[in-house]
Swiss-Prot record:
Its membrane topology: Multi-pass membrane protein
Organism of this sequence: Pectobacterium atrosepticum (strain SCRI 1043 / ATCC BAA-672)
Protein name: UPF0259 membrane protein ECA2305
The keyword Acetylation belongs to this UniProt entry's keyword annotation: no
Primary location group: membrane
Keywords tagged on the record: Cell inner membrane, Cell membrane, Membrane, Transmembrane, Transmembrane helix
Location of this chain's protein in the cell: Cell inner membrane
Signal peptide: none
Entry similarity comment: Belongs to the UPF0259 family.
The keyword Transmembrane belongs to this UniProt entry's keyword annotation: yes
GO cellular component: plasma membrane
Transmembrane segments: 20-40, 90-110, 132-152, 156-176, 192-212, 222-242
Pfam families linked: UPF0259
Length: 250
């Protein structure tokens, strides 16, 4: 029986509807963790004042480019900027790892007929979290590098790497073995993988644009809403990719 996008979409929506509460709770929980980690690791108010105190001087050179802007900063400002970037990157990475492991284990537990919850699914994913951490870090670096060069290489890399988290969890395979298998399967079934990845990327951009227009005065609440909706989209994509891999393996 051929694998069609309509079949995968229907199966994905059925699972999402049946497990909506657990998926929503997991999306919000990992969003809270991301925001809290980012807040805890970010520079203090005094350190941020170093950047804001000279914002008027730096704003005049924004048009010259990002690298020129960074070069014109003082060493103290560069250090604060690096800490901000590192905090945001690490917090997002931890949130993505917990979400990925939790969603994939939720699918497996439900498929085995076990009653589960968001917390139990995340806890059950503990043996895979370290491997997922390195995998997602590597995938993120590769995709962002591709996006910086040109958009198309980044999208192609996202497609190639899309099945690797599923393979790591279901097959308990190594990182590079999962990437190799994912690349082969993703491009062999491009009609099923490419539309899903492109829609996922577009949905994330749309969420960013829409949420930024909402009348929410609290930056923390805005961050939780943005991360929560983004996590929900990623969770649905993971369900789609898990179902696709199960059909391909069968």
């Amino acid at each position: 029986m051929p694998i069609t996008a309509n079949t995968l979409y229907r199966d994905t929506m059925n699972f999402t509807r049946n497990q909506l509460i657990s998926i929503l709770m997991m999306s919000l929980l990992t969003a809270f963790i991301t925001v809290i980690l980012n807040h805890a690791l970010s520079p203090s108010g005094d350190e941020l004042q170093i950047l804001s105190s000279s914002s008027s001087d730096l704003s005049s050179s924004v048009e010259s480019g990002l690298m020129d802007l960074i070069q014109q900063m003082t060493p103290e400002q560069q250090t604060v900027l690096l800490k901000m970037s590192a905090a945001g990157t690490f917090a997002a990475l931890v949130g993505n790892v917990l979400l990925t492991g939790g969603v994939l284990m939720l699918i497996q537990l439900v498929s085995d007929g076990q009653r589960t919850s968001a917390l139990r699914a995340i806890g059950a994913s503990a043996p895979f979290l370290l491997r997922l951490l390195f995998l997602i870090l590597l995938c993120t670096l590769l995709i962002q590098l591709g996006m910086m060069l040109l958009v198309i290489p980044g999208v192609l890399l996202a497609i190639a790497l899309s099945l690797s988290p599923v393979i790591v969890v279901t097959e308990k395979s190594g990182i590079f073995s999962a990437i190799k298998t994912s690349t082969k399967l993703a491009y062999s079934n491009l009609r099923a993988t490419a539309p899903a990845i492109v829609m996922w990327l577009l949905a994330k951009i749309a969420i960013l644009l829409i949420v930024s227009k909402l009348p929410i005065s609290s930056p923390t609440v805005l961050s939780v809403v943005l991360n929560g909706l983004s996590n929900l989209i990623s969770a649905i994509l993971l369900i789609y990719l898990f179902r696709l891999y199960m059909l391909l393996r069968a």
